[in-house]
Structure formats: C-alpha cells, structure tokens
Amino acid sequence: MESQETAKRPIEPNGAVAAQDAEPATKRVKLDDAPVPQIQEEPSQPQPQPQPQPQTEDEKPTEQRQDDRDKRRGIAPIKKEYLVVPPSQVAKTAEVVDDDAAEGRTAPGAEGAAGKDGKKKRPKGQNKEREFGIFADAQRLCNSVAWTPEFSPRHCKHGERCNALHDIRKYLKEGRRPDLNVFGGKCPVWETHGKCSSGWRCLFVESHMKEIEHEDGRKELVLTEDPTKIKPEAAPLVPPEEESMDARAGVYNVVAPAVKLALSRKKIQHEKSDQYLKWMAKDSELARIHYHKQKDDDDVAKDYAAQYVEPPLKPSEKRRIYFGRETPVLAPLTTQGNLPFRRLCVELGAEITYSEMALGLPLLQGQKADWTLMRAHESEITPPRYTPTGIVDPAYDNSKDLKFGVQITAHAPWIAIKSAETLARYLPHLRVIDLNCGCPIDMVYKSGAGSALLDAPSKLERMIRGMNTVSGEVPVTAKIRMGVRDNHLTAQKLVERLALGAPDIRAVSGAPGCAAVTLHGRTRQQRYTKAADWSYIAECAALVKSFNEKADSLQDTIREADERSLPNGGRMYFVGNGDCYSHVDYFNHVDNAKVDSVMVGRGAIIKPWIFEEISAGQYLDKSATERLAYVEKFAKYGMEAWGSDELGLNYTRRFLLEFLSFFHRYVPIGLLEYLPPAMNDRPPAYKGRNELETLLASKNYLDWIKISEMFLGPAPPNFKFQPKHKSNAYENIEAEG
C-alpha cells in the first residue's frame, strides 16, 4: 500500500497518469480518513452564459459541424477548456475498457496468454484469477461470546477443544485492529438500526458498548441498544443459533441454514417437479416418435394431439405483474448488482430490480454463495410505481406487487424446474423468477446454459412450461438476446414460441406461461463491440403485440384457455435492453420502439441517478460532492448488508471498488460540447471543474482504493484489488510496478 505521507501537490487530470507518470492522483494530495474528504469543492453554480460573439469555424456549435463530430465518433465531446491535451491528440488519450470482460470469462474464441506463434502477449481484457487478500482478525473471537455480555456467554459447542478467543477484553486489545475513526467513530449500522449485528467484532464497537459495575464491584462489558431505532421485525442482537448470525436488519429472503444443509444432503423433496418431470419425459418421447415419421406436418400434429396426455399438474394462478413507462428496470448485473447497489438505485428511482444471476445447480446443492444472492432489501419488497395511462390488466393489484425478482440459469430442464419450485417455497418475497437465456460468458455458454438456450428453443420452452407449473403464484419470465451469431438472429421466432408455444403443440398444450420477455439488442458474438440494435427490438415489440392479439383469437378458435397458463390475463410484457444512458434514451425507446419498459444495465452503474433523470424527465448535472455522497451511501449500505466487522467491511470495500470501476467513467454533462451523452463514447484525458471532480474521474485503481478509505478506513496491508476489466492505464501501471 502506498504511503499517504506525501507532500501536497495538485491533482493531475484524468488520463495524465498514462501520459506523464504512473503516480496516482491521491498520492499527490493528502486525503484524511475523515467522513468528509479534505478536498474542498466550490458550490455548484449555474454556468455563466457567454455574450454572443462572431464565431470562427472551430468555435461553432458541434451541431453545426457534423463533419467534426463524425471524425470524433466514439470519443466523448469534452469542451476544449477541460482537455489536457491538444484536440488533435484526443483520440490517443481516450480510455479503453472491456465491458465484455466485466461480464465474466473471455469472449468467444479468445486465446490464452500465448498467441499462435507461442509468444507471450501483453495482458489485456479481463483480470482472471483475481485475488483480494484474506480479511480476518489477528485472533478469532468465538461465536459463543460474540454478541453476549462479558459475564453471560452462551455454551460453546466445541468446549475445551475450541481454539478461538473467549476473553472479550483480550480480543478488543490484541485480537483485532483498533476502532476506525471514519463517520466520527460511530457505527453506521447502530446509528440506523439501534443495534449492531456484528457485536463485539464491529470496528466501531466503542460507540455501542459500555462498562457497568455490579454490586460486588465487578465490572462487565456489555453491548448497548437504542430501543427507539429498533424495528419490531428486526433480527435479535444475539442470534438464537450462531449459524444465523448473517441475519441483518432490513434484509429479507434469508434462508435458514438448516434448509441449505438439507439441500446439500439431498433431503429436500421436490414433489411437484418430480411428477412433472416424469410426465415430461414421456411426452418428449411421444413427440420424438411422431416427428420422426415420414408424414406431413399437419398429420404429425394430429397424431401427436390424438395421443397427447395432459400433465399431472396445472400451474397455480399467478400473481399479476405490470411493466410501464413509469417502471424503469434495473438489470440483473453480475458482481455489480449486489444488494447495496440495488438499494441505492431503488432510492434513486429504480422501480424493478433483479438479483445477480445464480446458477440453478448450486442452489439445489444448498451452496451459501448462491443463496446469498437471493436476498433483498426491505425497499425492494415494496410495490413499484403505478400510474398507467393505457389499457392494463383489470385484475392487477399493485398492493400485492413488489420490485424484487431473482434470476437463475440452468443447462437442463430438471435443474430449472426444481430450482423454481425451491425458490418459490423458501423465498417469500419474489416478484418473478427470471430465466437467463442470454448470458454470453464461456463458462455458462459451454455448459449449455445462458445464451446456449437460444439455439435450443424446444428445451427452453420445456423449461418455461415446467417452471411455470411448479412456481406457485410467482410468475416466470425470460431474458434473451437477438441470437448467438450475428448472421443468424433467432429472437423473433423465440419470442413467438414463448408467447404462444411451438406451432405444432400449441393447440393441445396452450401457451407456455411466460409472463414477460426482456430482449438485449445484441448477439452473443457481438457482445459490447457494437451498439444495441433497437430497430430489431422494435420489430420484436411489434410481433409481441400481434402475438398478444393472436393469443386471444387462439383462445376463441381452439378451446377455452386455462386461465392459470395465461399470466397477466393472456398478455406477455416485452422489455428492451441495451445502451440506455439517459432519460432521452429511455423515453425514445418506450415511445418509438414500443416496448413496455426499458431495462438499464451499465448506464446505471456509471450514473445511478439515471433513474432520477427518468423520473424528472431532464438531465441532472450532479456535482462531485453529490457523487461522492453516493459512494458514502454505498459504503454504509454495504456495512448494513455484510457487517461492520473486518470481514464485512472489506467485503464492502471490494464491491465498492467494483462499483467505482464503472462509476469513474461518468463525464459530467457540464463538460460536454453537446447532448445527449453516449455511454460508449470514450473520454479523453480531461480535468474536472474542481479537484474532487478530477479525482472521481481517475482511472487509476489506486485512487479508487484511496476513495474507499475515506469511508471504510485504511485498507488492510494484505488487501488486493485489480479491476475486472483492464484499460491501457492499468497495463501501464502494472508495467511500471
């Protein structure tokens, strides 16, 4: 870790680290560990309007210089006074990032560290096999005393064999580092909830402990509470079982350890899934036999219909959901879409959220990491905003709706179906269960899950039908891409199949029961190398509208449909996804592409207040102080979710740095020559309107660590962080040691 004992020097502008030296900006200005950074910022003021003067060709507005705009396509149009290099050198200093790497493993066909000629290549793309160090106290405190008064420990199940500390005073003196002085030394969790779930391990414990003297003269250390701040439904300070110590105030969908243990030992029965899967195997064999016969399609369909057997189970009536222009959607984001980040976005106006994608098989195996992804904050289990202007389902009850849904993926129908039954049984606060059919990363794709399902429409349909049958009242949705390959787009046929069912079986099977489809306007092959294709999304939106109308006619001409297989009264919602970076993008897509709503992904990580802009219908030029306040909130929300002890605090630090790896890419609109901003435009080297704004734009990850230290205290000596997606600047830093 770099020393902070350095002389004060001006912060270099964004990009200068690559052009001049590799010394981080925060090494050139001393930052204290105070809750508010010592960098002073001038209050935000309206920009003075210059008096009209004769303009030279170079001074004309960019709208009048289309040729210049074309020459600089892909480069953020930053005003000349903020550039630190001549305009002719702008393209050379523009930051290059790899958002494909941020999603997971390598892109299709990526080679290893050595090229075809055997020579070692320069590192680029994703940092694979990243390590973050080990975060632990010097001496471990036993759970039997971690939340109890000094003289009233609980029984230690390890007895004399326990190698953890049982002496609280010794632990506080020798077993951990001293209390932190950020936030004035007061525990953010205790200040919010009136108690701290980290107990004696909290790195702010001195703010919520006291020493009491008994009549016999003995002095005892006890933890304190503030009853006025404790909510009735909050978890107890002392967990009834030490394994449930991860229960946090304001966090829902926490599955009991006993359930996860039973899953890992295969002691949980999936009665509905087992019945349905047994029927599905017979039906699939029947379909296979008929479709291999040398007959016309009509004859095959008739033969299949004649021998078709109804499934043993029917779907339960689903809770109605709603998507509209007033319900912007936060995408399920790997790594970035954690609970503290979703909480921040909901606070700023996100109306619908999803968990990070979980793998179905680890869920069925009871793995803690995947079940942790299923947790929701209390703000996510409230109803979404509902101010409809068009025709909506009259049976929709907004008071029963909620914001939070979970996303899973699977490579086999039995995994998807059993996962849906398990999630619906043990998670009481679910809006939907979303099946990811678009994840492009190699590990998922090569297993047959994610975007591999785009080329297996029959298997995908069986998954949706089965999940819908066993998920109780929870609707099932799907997220797809345009296709796997650029020259073979499959989304239109797939959307029809999800809306109506396969043409040859829909007469007997009805609709699969998919409540909504989200289409990402890219192929797997394309990834983020090109802009999202909203014209194709618009074509699919028009098809969905016709399919919804067609579903009504099919009900009239074939047979009376089972209401339980028709979520939302027979209407399938359609959501578009890709490159939404402002309210202008959002409403343009809703009004012109005719989607029900828009899902926001990277745009929300770069500027979470995009949801605030959508609600306000205008651009918001956030000051550096306001943006730093979002970083502070993330830190507080992280400690509430993961704990204020050594482990939880550095878990928060790790995900805060992941957040900053996108957050720093925001270019304030006050610095741009023209609007709207484009998310894929790369910013050249520039300086902000003040030192703090310049610091927040730094692409040096060492600066991000220093920013985290403003709110989380000094990083441990063994803490490590490497950005998930590298840029040229990161390579230079590593090359220069």
Swiss-Prot record:
Belongs to the Dus family. Dus3 subfamily. Its EC number is 1.3.1.89, 1.3.1.-. Residues 35-44 have a biased composition (Low complexity). GO terms for cellular component: cytoplasm; nuclear periphery. FMN binds at residues 332-334, 407, 479, 520, 577-579, 601-602. The keyword Cytoplasm applies. One of its GO terms (molecular function) is mRNA dihydrouridine synthase activity. Gene3D superfamilies: Aldolase class I (3.20.20.70). Residues 1-11, 24-33, 57-82 have a biased composition (Basic and acidic residues). It comes from Neurospora crassa (strain ATCC 24698 / 74-OR23-1A / CBS 708.71 / DSM 1257 / FGSC 987). This is tRNA-dihydrouridine(47) synthase [NAD(P)(+)]. The keyword Acetylation does not apply. PROSITE patterns: UPF0034 (PS01136). The active site is at residue 439.
